[in-house]
């Protein structure tokens, strides 16, 4: 899935000039965890390459950062700028980042806000200071996603198998054109059925979700999906949601489409406030 997360502020977290004055390492933040008691850090994902093992840092009572020390030789501004041109490197970093975030979402009683890739501060103290300054913003996010998981639904139209109109010596021009029209009408009818199935899926699953967001189609996608949506689903409704998704998948097959359900994920698409999908 496409990675998203919380960014504490809009400008770069560490400027190039600041990095030049810093020695050795910086603090990389994976996520923020809210829980009544400190989570236990047991064996889990090792995190980014060249980084220290993920650790917890206290922000305030009931709130922790999951962070690591990263070498500026690998994660300084210039290094990251070069790395962003290498899609394989970005993919490896994203997978490692998400593995740490997802490990903490599995901790009982924890609510987790994933951070954007490359959320880096000069040190732990500076990171804590920034998070405390955003406490009101973070509190709103925690209230929105608490007790929920993100599930994704993607619906794509299947290719309609139609015989290619053949122009033969015995066939009249009008018969050939009529055959082409029947093929066009069949494709149009299927498209309309798929759109109706996608709309009904969005409504049915949306009724079980706390919030729904449409996701931006991937740039590399050759066939844009008819529906690509994320659903913020309360844990208590998870079984009902999955059952409804199974019924929707069957409806989509009948309409000539395929529904793919993914999840559960951390609430990547619900970190920022926004209107639910219509």
Predicted regions and their residues:
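An interfacial alpha-helical scaffold signature
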Residues: 14-15, 19-278
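N-terminal amphipathic/basic-hydrophobic helices that include classical n-h-c signal peptides
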Residues: 1-21
């Amino acid at each position: 899935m496409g990675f998203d997360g919380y960014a504490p502020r809009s400008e770069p977290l560490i400027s190039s000039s600041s990095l030049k004055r810093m020695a050795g390492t910086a603090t990389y933040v994976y996520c923020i965890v809210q829980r009544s008691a400190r989570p236990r850090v047991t064996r889990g994902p090792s995190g980014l390459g060249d980084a220290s093992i993920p650790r917890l840092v206290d922000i305030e009572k009931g709130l922790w950062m999951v962070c690591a020390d990263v070498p500026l030789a690998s994660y300084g501004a210039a290094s990251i700028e070069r790395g962003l041109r290498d899609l394989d490197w970005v993919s490896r970093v994203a997978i490692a980042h998400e593995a740490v975030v997802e490990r903490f979402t599995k901790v009982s009683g924890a609510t987790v806000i994933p951070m954007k890739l490359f959320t880096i501060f000069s040190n732990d103290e500076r990171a804590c200071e920034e998070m405390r300054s955003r406490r009101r913003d973070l509190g709103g996010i925690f209230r929105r996603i608490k007790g929920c998981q993100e599930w994704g639904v993607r619906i794509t139209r299947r290719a309609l198998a139609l015989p290619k109109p053949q122009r033969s010596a015995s066939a009249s021009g009008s018969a050939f054109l009529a055959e082409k029209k029947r093929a066009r009408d069949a494709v149009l009818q299927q498209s309309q059925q798929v759109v109706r199935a996608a709309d009904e899926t969005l409504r049915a699953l949306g009724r079980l979700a706390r919030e729904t967001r449409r996701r931006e189609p991937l740039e590399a996608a050759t066939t844009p999906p008819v529906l690509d949506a994320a659903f913020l689903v309360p844990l208590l409704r998870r079984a009902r949601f999955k059952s409804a998704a199974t019924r929707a998948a069957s409806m989509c097959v009948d309409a000539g489409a395929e529904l793919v359900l993914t999840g559960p994920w951390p609430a990547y698409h619900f970190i920022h406030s926004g209107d639910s999908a219509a």
